[in-house]
Amino acid sequence: MLILFNTFAELPEAYKAFAPTVDVLPLIPLFFFLLVFVWQAAVGFK
């Protein structure tokens, strides 16, 4: 099963230049999640 996931984890050759961007993409929802807490702290958790 691990071999199957490893096969899909590699980007095609044409997209190798975008590898650093693709590595950061999963973190974007986490930034929004943290932004919710910062926003609520700013308005006093109403």
Curated annotation (Swiss-Prot):
GO biological process: photosynthesis
Family: Belongs to the PsbK family.
Keyword Thylakoid: yes
Residue ranges crossing the lipid bilayer per the database entry: 25-45
Pfam families: PsbK
The protein's assembly and partners: PSII is composed of 1 copy each of membrane proteins PsbA, PsbB, PsbC, PsbD, PsbE, PsbF, PsbH, PsbI, PsbJ, PsbK, PsbL, PsbM, PsbT, PsbX, PsbY, Psb30/Ycf12, peripheral proteins PsbO, CyanoQ (PsbQ), PsbU, PsbV and a large number of cofactors. It forms dimeric complexes.
Protein purpose: One of the components of the core complex of photosystem II (PSII). PSII is a light-driven water:plastoquinone oxidoreductase that uses light energy to abstract electrons from H(2)O, generating O(2) and a proton gradient subsequently used for ATP formation. It consists of a core antenna complex that captures photons, and an electron transfer chain that converts photonic excitation into a charge separation.
A cellular-component GO term for this protein: plasma membrane-derived thylakoid membrane
Species in which this protein is naturally found: Prochlorococcus marinus (strain MIT 9301)
Listed SUPFAM superfamilies: Photosystem II reaction center protein K, PsbK
Keyword Transmembrane attached: yes
InterPro entries recorded: PSII_PsbK, PSII_PsbK_sf
Name the record gives this protein: Photosystem II reaction center protein K
Pro-piece positions: 1-9
Highest taxon in the source lineage: Bacteria
Name of the gene encoding the protein in the UniProt record: psbK
Annotated compartments: Cellular thylakoid membrane
Keywords noted in UniProt: Membrane, Photosynthesis, Photosystem II, Reaction center, Thylakoid, Transmembrane, Transmembrane helix
Topology in membrane: Single-pass membrane protein
